[in-house]
């Protein structure tokens, strides 16, 4: 029997423990008539329950802390050393925060959900979630790997997450913290604390940050990417920041989905960390994304969507947030890798970027050094929405296409990834799903044809030319791309000089961003693989 004595975590006099509740019980619990506020779920006409998370409709990166002690002092990439969210916390302040959460959870009826993070038995984390809110228990049951009955019998957690969303920290100013809310980690005690924020994603991304700490130290790549596998067993991984196409491009009727967001790569191959998907639902339609739409049914959990009095969901309504979401168990998608979300070694590594500057080609093949350079740069760009004319694009450089979730220095992830790629003989490509000189976004049809050419290997037969300034190898034509002129971004401009001006501007931004990596010999050597001014 698993040890359910919560007093070892500081939680006392518990009224009742609802341990590993079924989906049916969770449905009953989260829709009870006597619930109020953010605890109460609404049944929608799609069968899924919808909940609200209040003002917290996304993560709170400024409220993220890691205890700086003997375990972490020399390993964590601290916020005072780089642009990231790993703010140090003293053990003394940690103990005060822990006291707040354990006091909040004591004397209550609690939900305890035991899960795994990581599909590989050798390196997975056994994670126990403790919460007083039924839908939060539902969220982690969806998102993490659900152990078998046999595994649950002897379950002993490696890591514990205590979610005290209802409690806040009144001493935050005195403790020199960011606000009354907190998401804090102690890697010695192996505990995560959540206070003040109701956003479900804090539990998901919290454990991703922990996998990002433990795995690279063991030589295993930990990646913010989606992954799929073809009928011949050929694996592809898709790195990219939010909005670049990770979920859309990896959901392919010809290929089985391994996972849509978080993966590891070890001696056996690529494996999912999760047991579910957390998909954006803004402007979702059955026609454009049938797989995701059809996954929204009983046992799925909608967040911050608009629901009318009849339970009808309006996916186009962004009045609460643009970041409307749904979590569902991965088996709600038909074409997935079964029974375990893992496959062999990746042969194709695809970096997705949405370049709003109109400079980068739709696809370029990268050398080993360029792959490291662009992985460390993690570039994408956003366009502020205007009705006509191109506004100033905003560049985003997020190391490893996921700086917010990195616990170690970015170069450690790059080194591990490159070793895995070399051992597998994997090729790397930079795919731009953004804009070109026409002012329009590259069509999803053209991007899918490019992805097909990468995955079936036909891109290797193409003739390549070099793009100036960036020294990227671009194919001159590809099967399925009807207008091959789009493959060279220069040809999409009426005035050749305009591309050149934009390219120099973007190149300068790349160079300035990469300066922070030139404090190591490896980083200095990679400068030559980036844009040249």
UniProtKB/Swiss-Prot annotation:
It catalyses: oxaloacetate + ATP = phosphoenolpyruvate + ADP + CO2. Mn(2+) binds at residues 205, 224, 261. Pathway: Carbohydrate biosynthesis; gluconeogenesis. Keywords: ATP-binding, Cytoplasm, Decarboxylase, Gluconeogenesis, Lyase, Manganese, Metal-binding, Nucleotide-binding. It is an enzyme of class 4 (lyase). PROSITE patterns: PEPCK_ATP (PS00532). InterPro entries: PEP_carboxykinase_ATP, PEP_carboxykinase_C, PEP_carboxykinase_N, PEPCK_ATP_CS. The keyword Membrane does not apply. It comes from the Bacteria. It holds the Pfam family PEPCK_ATP. Substrate binds at residues 59, 199, 205, 325. Involved in the gluconeogenesis. Catalyzes the conversion of oxaloacetate (OAA) to phosphoenolpyruvate (PEP) through direct phosphoryl transfer between the nucleoside triphosphate and OAA. PANTHER family: PHOSPHOENOLPYRUVATE CARBOXYKINASE (ATP), PHOSPHOENOLPYRUVATE CARBOXYKINASE ATP. Monomer. This is Phosphoenolpyruvate carboxykinase (ATP).
């Amino acid at each position: 029997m698993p040890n359910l004595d919560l007093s070892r975590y500081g939680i006392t006099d518990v009224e009742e423990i609802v341990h590993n509740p079924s989906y049916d019980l969770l449905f009953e619990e989260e829709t009870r008539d006597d619930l109020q506020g953010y605890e109460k779920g609404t049944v929608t006409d799609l069968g899924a329950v919808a909940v609200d998370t209040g003002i917290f409709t996304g993560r709170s990166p400024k409220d993220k802390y890691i205890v700086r002690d003997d375990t972490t002092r020399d390993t964590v990439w601290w916020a005072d050393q780089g642009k990231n969210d790993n703010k140090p916390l003293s053990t003394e302040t940690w103990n005060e925060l822990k006291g707040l959460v354990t006091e909040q959870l004591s004397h209550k009826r609690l939900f305890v959900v035991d899960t795994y993070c990581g599909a590989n038995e050798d390196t997975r984390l056994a994670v126990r979630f403790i919460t007083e809110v039924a839908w939060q228990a539902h969220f982690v049951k969806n998102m993490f790997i659900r152990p078998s009955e046999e595994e649950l019998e002897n379950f002993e957690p490696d890591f514990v997450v205590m979610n005290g969303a209802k409690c806040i920290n009144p001493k935050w100013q005195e403790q020199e913290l960011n606000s009354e809310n907190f998401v804090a980690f102690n890697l010695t005690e192996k505990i995560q604390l959540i206070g003040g924020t109701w956003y479900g994603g804090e539990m998901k991304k919290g454990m991703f940050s922990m996998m990002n700490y433990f795995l690279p130290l063991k030589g295993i790549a930990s990646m913010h990417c989606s992954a799929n596998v073809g009928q011949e067993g050929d694996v592809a991984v898709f790195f990219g920041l939010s909005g670049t196409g990770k979920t859309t491009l990896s959901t392919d009727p010809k290929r089985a989905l391994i996972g849509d967001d978080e993966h590891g790569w070890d001696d056996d191959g690529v494996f999912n960390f999760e047991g579910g998907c957390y998909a954006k639902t803004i402007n979702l339609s059955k026609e454009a994304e049938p797989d995701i739409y059809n996954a929204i049914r009983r046992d799925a959990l909608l967040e911050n969507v608009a629901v009318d009095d009849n339970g009808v969901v309006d996916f186009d309504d962004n009045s609460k947030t643009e970041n409307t979401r749904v979590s569902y168990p991965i088996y709600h998608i038909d074409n997935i890798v079964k029974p375990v979300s893992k496959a062999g070694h990746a042969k194709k590594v695809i970096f997705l970027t949405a370049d709003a500057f109109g400079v980068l080609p739709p696809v370029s093949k990268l050398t080993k050094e360029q792959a490291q350079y662009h992985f460390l740069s993690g570039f994408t760009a956003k366009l502020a929405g205007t009705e006509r004319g191109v506004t100033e694009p905003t560049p985003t450089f997020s190391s490893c296409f996921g700086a917010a979730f990195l616990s170690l220095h970015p170069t450690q992830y790059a080194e591990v990834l490159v070793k895995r790629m070399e051992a597998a003989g994997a090729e790397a490509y930079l795919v731009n799903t953004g804009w070109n000189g026409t002012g329009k976004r590259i069509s999803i049809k053209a991007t899918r044809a490019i992805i097909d050419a990468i995955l079936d290997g036909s891109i290797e037969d193409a003739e390549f030319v070099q793009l100036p300034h960036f020294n990227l190898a671009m194919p001159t034509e590809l099967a399925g791309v009807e207008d091959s002129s789009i493959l060279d971004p220069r040809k999409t401009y009426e005035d050749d000089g305009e591309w050149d001006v934009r390219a120099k501007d973007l190149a300068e931004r790349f160079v300035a961003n990469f300066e922070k990596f030139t404090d190591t010999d490896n980083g200095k050597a990679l400068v030559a693989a980036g844009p040249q001014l």
